[in-house]
């Protein structure tokens, strides 16, 4: 498998990962995103093949049985997975590739990119954080697509998602959208050392985001990534 570099981007739902990736794709002509498969119900503003490949549970399970996924996971009772074929096609064309996946998928990708049988390059992991717990809760409620029980469940699960931030090479805070995009471009260009060395400055933010729900401000938290 020839081609460019592999970047894995994960975040709790509501952190703005998808918007950031779309802006990166608009600015970086050699960058491609590997569109995931999912059994989740398609939302009104989503396009099949652009946002996800929407498939049935039997179709997804058939791909799992055929070893058709580089990684897959079950999140919020729905399956998500990255197709080996789609990834191979992007690398075959010489593109750099982004995977928008959750921390579970990122763990699988890290393991398999060190497996010489797959022929995959090593991957660079990037975790997106919201600027605060309250901001994350507000973004989730602002979607208007989920009821209060679903939002509460996602907010409760966000703490667990964000405890995995240290497993990634870089952490980017999506407070100012333009700045976050610029930081991602620096990482893609191989100039992310300043971000790596500045992670200690995130300690106060992480203390807020990772506090138990009872100790957190009333604003809330967030959920698993690929929603």
Regions found by a protein language model. Name each.
Residues 10-12:
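P-loop (Walker A) phosphate-binding loop of NTP-binding proteins
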Residues 15:
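ATP-binding Walker
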């Amino acid at each position: 498998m020839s081609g460019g570099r592999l970047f894995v981007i994960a975040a709790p739902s509501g952190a703005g990962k998808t918007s950031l990736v779309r802006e990166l794709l608009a600015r970086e002509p050699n960058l491609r995103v590997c569109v995931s498969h999912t059994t989740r119900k398609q939302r009104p503003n989503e396009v099949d093949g652009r946002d996800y490949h929407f498939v049935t549970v039997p179709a997804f399970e058939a791909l799992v049985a055929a070893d058709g996924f580089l990684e897959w996971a079950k999140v919020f009772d729905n399956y998500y997975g990255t197709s080996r074929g789609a990834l191979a096609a992007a690398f075959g064309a010489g593109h750099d590739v982004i995977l928008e996946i959750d921390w579970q998928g990122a763990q699988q990708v890290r393991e398999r990119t060190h497996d010489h049988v797959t022929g995959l390059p090593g991957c660079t992991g990037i975790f997106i954080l919201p600027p605060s717990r309250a901001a994350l809760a507000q973004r989730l409620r602002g979607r208007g697509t989920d009821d209060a029980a679903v939002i509460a469940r996602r907010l409760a699960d966000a703490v667990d998602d964000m405890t995995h931030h240290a497993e990634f090479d870089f952490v980017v805070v999506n407070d100012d959208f333009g700045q976050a995009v610029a930081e991602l471009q620096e990482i893609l260009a191989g100039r992310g050392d300043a971000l790596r060395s500045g992670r200690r400055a995130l300690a106060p933010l992480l203390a807020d985001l990772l506090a138990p729900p009872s100790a957190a401000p009333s604003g809330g938290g967030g959920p698993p990534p690929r929603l």
